[in-house]
């Protein structure tokens, strides 16, 4: 998703990102039901590679920038830390990424609300996915928000985010 809502997005990066996202949406829940299915695992490995191709065209943006203090201070694994904010960021960036979101929804036969729910469901039962579940004290959210501004990452987001915006996202991610 970060390659889609990135100021450096281009048709190639967007196509790679949409391909990776659609494959993850198609295979994520299936893997939870059958962890030993090598075909599904292979599909997800290909998705990760294609997502990497998208990033190689754009670099990363707000989700990665916000992930760094989560990993450094609380040991949240990189993949979780960099994906935990995707839903609120998708909503913030939604108006500027309508066409790619429509393609993702159409390719997966989902409404926008179903897309959000599918994304939310993928990590359920697999990894903790709220900041509270990771043991982050709520009074640390302002500090995390202040530390979330990595030059060359946060400023790639198509919507310019303020510290208050990031604090709002972190509060949204705190608990369900």
Which residues does each predicted region cover?
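Short, amphipathic C-terminal "tail helix"
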Residues: 140-176
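Alpha-helix C-capping/helix-to-loop hinge sites
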Residues: 3-8, 31, 51, 73, ...
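Glycine-rich phosphate/pyrophosphate-binding beta-alpha loops
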Residues: 49-82, 151-155
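Predominant activation on well-ordered alpha-helical scaffold segments within soluble catalytic domains
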Residues: 1-2, 18-29, 42-49, 63, ...
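Gly/Pro-rich interdomain helix-loop hinge
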Residues: 70-140
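Short helix-capping/linker segments at secondary-structure and domain boundaries
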Residues: 4-9, 58-59, 92-99, 176
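Carboxylate- and glycine-rich phosphate/diphosphate-binding segment that chelates Mg2+/Mn2+
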Residues: 1-58, 157-158, 164
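Alpha-helix N-cap/helix-start motif at coil-to-helix transitions, marked by capping-box chemistry
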Residues: 11-22, 60, 80, 95, ...
